[in-house]
Design a protein with these regions (language model features):
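Conserved GNAT acetyl-CoA-binding A-motif
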Residues: 134-143
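Proline- and acidic/polar-enriched loop/turn elements at helix boundaries
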Residues: 41, 126, 143-144, 167
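GNAT-family acyltransferases
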Residues: 1-113, 134, 161-163, 168-185
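Conserved acetyl-CoA-binding loop-helix of GNAT-fold acetyltransferases
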Residues: 108, 116-130, 152-157
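Conserved G/P- and acidic residue-centered "switch" motifs that form tight phosphate/ATP-binding loops
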Residues: 85, 118, 148
Length: 185
Protein backbone atom coordinates (compact mmCIF):
# COMPACT_ATOMS: atom_id res chain seq x y z
CA UNK A 1 0.00 0.00 0.00
CA UNK A 2 3.01 2.29 0.36
CA UNK A 3 3.57 4.91 -2.33
CA UNK A 4 0.06 4.68 -3.74
CA UNK A 5 -1.35 7.90 -5.14
CA UNK A 6 -4.20 8.98 -2.85
CA UNK A 7 -6.65 11.89 -2.77
CA UNK A 8 -8.43 12.77 0.47
CA UNK A 9 -12.04 13.56 -0.40
CA UNK A 10 -13.69 13.84 3.02
CA UNK A 11 -15.16 10.59 4.27
CA UNK A 12 -13.56 8.66 1.44
CA UNK A 13 -10.21 8.41 -0.29
CA UNK A 14 -9.47 7.98 -3.95
CA UNK A 15 -6.45 5.76 -4.42
CA UNK A 16 -4.72 3.75 -7.09
CA UNK A 17 -5.97 0.22 -7.69
CA UNK A 18 -3.94 -2.59 -6.12
CA UNK A 19 -3.96 -6.31 -6.82
CA UNK A 20 -5.76 -6.86 -3.51
CA UNK A 21 -8.75 -4.91 -4.91
CA UNK A 22 -9.52 -7.46 -7.64
CA UNK A 23 -12.19 -9.34 -5.70
CA UNK A 24 -13.90 -6.13 -4.59
CA UNK A 25 -13.85 -4.72 -8.14
CA UNK A 26 -15.19 -8.01 -9.50
CA UNK A 27 -17.98 -8.08 -6.89
CA UNK A 28 -18.87 -4.46 -7.59
CA UNK A 29 -18.98 -4.85 -11.37
CA UNK A 30 -21.07 -8.01 -11.00
CA UNK A 31 -23.89 -6.07 -9.33
CA UNK A 32 -26.83 -5.60 -11.73
CA UNK A 33 -27.12 -2.01 -10.50
CA UNK A 34 -23.60 -1.39 -11.84
CA UNK A 35 -23.46 -3.35 -15.09
CA UNK A 36 -26.85 -1.97 -16.14
CA UNK A 37 -25.09 1.35 -16.68
CA UNK A 38 -21.50 0.17 -17.25
CA UNK A 39 -21.75 -3.11 -19.17
CA UNK A 40 -18.14 -2.92 -20.39
CA UNK A 41 -16.94 -3.34 -16.80
CA UNK A 42 -18.60 -6.75 -16.43
CA UNK A 43 -16.03 -9.55 -16.56
CA UNK A 44 -14.88 -12.80 -15.09
CA UNK A 45 -12.64 -12.64 -12.04
CA UNK A 46 -9.73 -13.85 -14.20
CA UNK A 47 -10.31 -11.05 -16.74
CA UNK A 48 -10.49 -8.50 -13.93
CA UNK A 49 -7.21 -9.76 -12.46
CA UNK A 50 -5.58 -9.49 -15.89
CA UNK A 51 -6.93 -5.98 -16.47
CA UNK A 52 -5.91 -4.68 -13.04
CA UNK A 53 -2.45 -6.26 -13.25
CA UNK A 54 -1.56 -5.57 -16.87
CA UNK A 55 -3.49 -2.43 -17.75
CA UNK A 56 -5.06 -0.45 -14.93
CA UNK A 57 -2.13 -0.36 -12.50
CA UNK A 58 0.47 0.37 -15.24
CA UNK A 59 -1.86 2.95 -16.85
CA UNK A 60 -2.17 4.78 -13.52
CA UNK A 61 1.62 4.86 -13.10
CA UNK A 62 2.02 6.24 -16.63
CA UNK A 63 -0.69 8.87 -16.06
CA UNK A 64 0.91 10.05 -12.81
CA UNK A 65 4.42 10.09 -14.31
CA UNK A 66 3.21 12.49 -17.00
CA UNK A 67 1.36 15.03 -14.84
CA UNK A 68 0.70 17.81 -15.80
CA UNK A 69 0.70 16.83 -19.50
CA UNK A 70 -1.50 13.74 -19.33
CA UNK A 71 -2.46 13.56 -23.01
CA UNK A 72 -4.85 10.68 -23.68
CA UNK A 73 -3.80 8.63 -20.66
CA UNK A 74 -6.26 7.02 -18.25
CA UNK A 75 -6.34 6.98 -14.46
CA UNK A 76 -8.64 4.61 -12.56
CA UNK A 77 -8.94 5.14 -8.84
CA UNK A 78 -10.70 3.14 -6.17
CA UNK A 79 -13.16 4.81 -3.84
CA UNK A 80 -12.35 3.54 -0.35
CA UNK A 81 -13.77 4.35 3.05
CA UNK A 82 -11.22 6.45 4.91
CA UNK A 83 -11.79 4.67 8.24
CA UNK A 84 -11.58 1.06 7.00
CA UNK A 85 -9.90 1.14 3.55
CA UNK A 86 -12.88 -0.86 2.24
CA UNK A 87 -13.11 -0.65 -1.56
CA UNK A 88 -16.63 0.59 -2.39
CA UNK A 89 -16.38 1.99 -5.92
CA UNK A 90 -14.22 3.61 -8.56
CA UNK A 91 -13.76 7.03 -10.14
CA UNK A 92 -11.87 7.30 -13.43
CA UNK A 93 -10.71 9.76 -16.02
CA UNK A 94 -9.84 9.06 -19.63
CA UNK A 95 -10.69 9.85 -23.22
CA UNK A 96 -14.25 9.31 -24.46
CA UNK A 97 -13.72 8.54 -28.12
CA UNK A 98 -17.35 9.15 -29.03
CA UNK A 99 -17.02 12.84 -28.11
CA UNK A 100 -15.31 15.51 -30.16
CA UNK A 101 -12.41 17.26 -28.45
CA UNK A 102 -11.76 18.18 -25.78
CA UNK A 103 -13.02 14.74 -24.84
CA UNK A 104 -11.60 13.88 -21.42
CA UNK A 105 -14.32 12.34 -19.28
CA UNK A 106 -14.95 11.33 -15.72
CA UNK A 107 -16.74 8.06 -15.00
CA UNK A 108 -17.62 6.42 -11.72
CA UNK A 109 -19.64 3.79 -9.94
CA UNK A 110 -20.30 2.81 -6.36
CA UNK A 111 -21.52 -0.36 -4.69
CA UNK A 112 -25.25 -0.66 -4.14
CA UNK A 113 -24.46 -0.93 -0.42
CA UNK A 114 -23.00 2.61 -0.29
CA UNK A 115 -25.36 4.67 -2.40
CA UNK A 116 -27.13 7.83 -1.23
CA UNK A 117 -24.42 8.68 1.30
CA UNK A 118 -22.64 11.39 -0.70
CA UNK A 119 -19.54 9.28 -1.35
CA UNK A 120 -19.79 9.42 -5.14
CA UNK A 121 -20.19 13.21 -5.10
CA UNK A 122 -17.13 13.50 -2.83
CA UNK A 123 -15.14 11.27 -5.20
CA UNK A 124 -16.09 13.14 -8.37
CA UNK A 125 -15.40 16.52 -6.77
CA UNK A 126 -12.04 15.25 -5.54
CA UNK A 127 -11.02 13.98 -8.97
CA UNK A 128 -12.25 17.12 -10.73
CA UNK A 129 -10.36 19.38 -8.32
CA UNK A 130 -7.19 17.32 -8.74
CA UNK A 131 -7.38 17.36 -12.54
CA UNK A 132 -8.02 21.10 -12.77
CA UNK A 133 -5.34 21.99 -10.19
CA UNK A 134 -2.58 19.61 -11.32
CA UNK A 135 -2.97 18.84 -15.02
CA UNK A 136 -3.42 20.66 -18.30
CA UNK A 137 -7.10 19.68 -18.47
CA UNK A 138 -9.37 22.65 -19.21
CA UNK A 139 -12.69 20.83 -19.71
CA UNK A 140 -14.23 17.61 -18.42
CA UNK A 141 -17.11 15.62 -19.84
CA UNK A 142 -19.48 12.96 -18.60
CA UNK A 143 -22.02 10.90 -20.49
CA UNK A 144 -24.95 9.39 -18.63
CA UNK A 145 -28.05 7.47 -19.58
CA UNK A 146 -31.15 9.57 -18.85
CA UNK A 147 -32.62 6.79 -16.68
CA UNK A 148 -29.55 6.84 -14.41
CA UNK A 149 -31.09 9.43 -12.13
CA UNK A 150 -28.51 9.11 -9.35
CA UNK A 151 -25.61 9.74 -11.71
CA UNK A 152 -27.35 12.74 -13.24
CA UNK A 153 -27.76 14.18 -9.72
CA UNK A 154 -24.09 13.59 -8.87
CA UNK A 155 -22.98 15.55 -11.93
CA UNK A 156 -25.32 18.45 -11.13
CA UNK A 157 -24.00 18.57 -7.53
CA UNK A 158 -20.45 18.65 -8.89
CA UNK A 159 -21.12 21.66 -11.12
CA UNK A 160 -21.41 19.90 -14.49
CA UNK A 161 -23.82 21.41 -17.02
CA UNK A 162 -26.05 19.43 -19.34
CA UNK A 163 -24.92 20.52 -22.80
CA UNK A 164 -26.79 18.13 -25.06
CA UNK A 165 -27.44 14.56 -26.07
CA UNK A 166 -25.25 12.01 -27.79
CA UNK A 167 -26.01 8.55 -29.12
CA UNK A 168 -23.54 5.88 -28.01
CA UNK A 169 -24.04 2.22 -28.91
CA UNK A 170 -27.60 2.95 -30.09
CA UNK A 171 -28.60 4.56 -26.79
CA UNK A 172 -29.30 8.20 -26.03
CA UNK A 173 -26.99 9.65 -23.38
CA UNK A 174 -26.94 13.05 -21.74
CA UNK A 175 -23.67 14.91 -22.32
CA UNK A 176 -22.41 17.03 -19.43
CA UNK A 177 -19.42 19.37 -19.38
CA UNK A 178 -17.48 21.25 -16.75
CA UNK A 179 -15.03 23.96 -17.81
CA UNK A 180 -12.13 24.81 -15.52
CA UNK A 181 -12.44 28.59 -15.87
CA UNK A 182 -16.15 28.41 -14.92
CA UNK A 183 -15.47 26.27 -11.86
CA UNK A 184 -12.64 28.52 -10.67
CA UNK A 185 -14.75 31.73 -10.79
Amino acid sequence: MDNLFTLDCGEILLREFRIEDVDAIYELTSQPEVYEFLPDWRSTREQRLDWVTNYEIPDNKEFLANVPSIGERWMKLGIVLKETDEFIGFCNTGIKEELSGPNREVAYSISKHYRNKGYTTQAVKGLVNYLFANTDVEQLNAVVLPRNLASNKVLAKCGFHLTGNIEIENQLHYHYTLVKKELMK
